[in-house]
Amino acid sequence: MADIKTGIFAKNVQKRLNRAQEKVLQKLGKADETKDEQFEEYVQNFKRQEAEGTRLQRELRGYLAAIKGMQEASMKLTESLHEVYEPDWYGREDVKMVGEKCDVLWEDFHQKLVDGSLLTLDTYLGQFPDIKNRIAKRSRKLVDYDSARHHLEALQSSKRKDESRISKAEEEFQKAQKVFEEFNVDLQEELPSLWSSRVGFYVNTFKNVSSLEAKFHKEIAVLCHKLYEVMTKLGDQHADKAFSIQGAPSDSGPLRIAKTPSPPEEPSPLPSPTASPNHTLAPASPAPVRPRSPSQTRKGPPVPPLPKVTPTKELKQENIINFFEDNFVPEINVTTPSQNEVLEVKKEETLLDLDFDPFKPDVAPAGSAAATHSPMSQTLPWDLWTTSTDLVQPASGGSFNDFTQAQDTSLFTMQTDQNMAETEQALPTEPQAEEPPATAAAPTAGLDLGLEMEEPKEEAVIPPATDTGETVETAVPTEGAPVEEAEAEKAALPAGEGGSPEGAKIDGESTELAISESPQPVEPEAGAPQVIPSVVIEPASNHEGEGEHQETATGTEPREAAEDVAAQGSAGEKQEVATEPTPLDSQATLPASAGAVDASLSAGDATQELPPGFLYKVETLHDFEAANSDELNLQRGDVVLVVPSDSEADQDAGWLVGVKESDWLQYRDLATYKGLFPENFTRRLE
């Protein structure tokens, strides 16, 4: 008996040695290896199928454990409700019955899932271990087959052939081949069939789970509705004991998670003692309040850092009242709310820069809608003045169609023949070289002397385009007729150069002043006299950057003519005289006028290059990093062109829609490069 066991053990050891030797030779490349690529693919699919089935079994067991936990939790909940239920309350027995039936439903649902799905899954996975063992055994038989084949080939190729050994090797080879074929054929049939059967198994399993769950929820919904009706009737029975949650949010809803980083806090620099004469710091205002975000859409923009502490030297100069004017009156400005959003730091002035000329008009800065009074009207009591609060639209056509400017309101009156005669006598035959031509407009010639001028009802407003500035006024002196808009540009030519036939010759002067441009000539109505403005020449002022306007002129007059006009205005006739400082060199007038035309044309082209629906420009004060694809990435100092927002909710939350000016000038694509950005990160530009 011991000999038999020893023989079997020795035989198994010999097989293991032969297999190990064969594998080593195959790894070293000294012996060929039989391979079946199709069978190897079947083995890979089998391993994948086994892993998927094992995971499904694990998750189903977890699902059943959760059902068991829900059963216990539901039972404890209904028991606690039954314990707190008072005997005199409505539906005490119904509550107990609902709890018991719910427990039965949970138990039935759990048991059916175990019987219909879990046991089936266990049976499905039970066939994998046997097939796995057969695959491993086939691999061993394949090594034995290769070893017997190599041994037979070695004996047949040797020089000294031993027929007995060769015949014995052939028998061993045929035996190994037969055993390998048995395992190989069976697995070649079973593995593809098992791989295909997984689809039907998954279908049956999840159909069973879904049908059982649907039936369970349908039955338990009836019990839940029953419990709801009991609670409703109990509430009606005790209506005077209603319960309300105090302090509960009314608009609590899911918000869009948009984590937008706030800009980094910038440390406020300590002001030096020499920065301000009184060493007083301006109080730091708190950060702007984060706007309310629209519900269920987008949170408001991030909060910018606190403003830097600045010395009191940066006080606005417009708050200082000038008491040194001859006609001191408070200035009345009518501005729109949008203009108050951006504070402009005005240029500081000294007493040496003040102009004490009573004929100098108070002119509002370019771009504002302020309505000021002419100097001639300042002789009246200040409480009798009128202020125009209407915003004047820009005149269309010509080189001025892209600018808007507030026009001085003035009253025109007719001049008598005597005034005309005095004005013509005061005209010099030759302009003085040291007195540069200054332009002014006043309706003096070509008017019917029997009619009085009415107050203009409409005014065409044009801002200055260059340093010298140009202002074109139009007024129709007809009775009750609307004022037609007229625009003209001044071109002052030196003596000896030709002019257009539209210029008026004065007392045999050889110099003619031509009107270079007239985009919209005056179209007077029937019976209305034609207005030909005269010219008043004033000495040039050295005040640079005061923002005064020049009016269109067709001739030149000395300063004495302006004084005569002022004397007539004080006698009861109202007239507007506007002066503008000009360079001392009269030869520079023509290049300045040409530059004004070029500047206005370029400004018109710039307006046409703005995106559709353009509202205004803003400058970024802080860096902003976009948290979503529909937001802009902004750096400090970027200029953004604001366009109307598609969503009122985003606008109410403090977001604006716009496109970076650099992207717009480069790509001209508003739909691709526009995006949202926080309004409180920017400041508005005029």
UniProtKB/Swiss-Prot annotation:
Keyword set, alphabetical order: Coiled coil, Cytoplasm, Cytoplasmic vesicle, Cytoskeleton, Membrane, Phosphoprotein, SH3 domain, Synapse
UniProt domain BAR: residue ranges: 24-240
Modified residues (Phosphothreonine): T260, T280
GO cellular component term, pick one: photoreceptor ribbon synapse
UniProt topology in membrane: Peripheral membrane protein
Modified residues (Phosphoserine): S252, S262, S268, S272, S276, S500, S629
Coiled-coil stretches noted in the UniProt entry, renumbered to this chain: 10-83, 144-191
Residue span, SH3 domain: 613-686
Compartments, record wording: Cytoplasmic vesicle, Secretory vesicle, Synaptic vesicle membrane; Cytoplasm, Cytoskeleton
Record-linked SMART domains: BAR (SM00721), SH3 (SM00326)
Residue stretches of biased makeup (Low complexity): 424-441
GO BP term (any one): synaptic vesicle endocytosis
Region (Disordered): 244-314, 421-441, 483-597
InterPro entries: AH/BAR_dom_sf, Amphiphysin, Amphiphysin_1, Amphiphysin_I_SH3, BAR_dom, SH3-like_dom_sf, SH3_domain
Extent of Pro residues compositional bias: 261-274
Amino acid composition bias (Basic and acidic residues), ranges on this chain: 541-562
Keyword Electron transport: no
Subunit details: Heterodimer with BIN1. Binds SH3GLB1. Interacts with REPS1 and SGIP1. Binds AP2A2. Interacts with AP2B1. Interacts with DNM1 and SYNJ1.
Function: May participate in mechanisms of regulated exocytosis in synapses and certain endocrine cell types. May control the properties of the membrane associated cytoskeleton.
Protein name, as recorded: Amphiphysin
Organism encoding this protein: Mus musculus
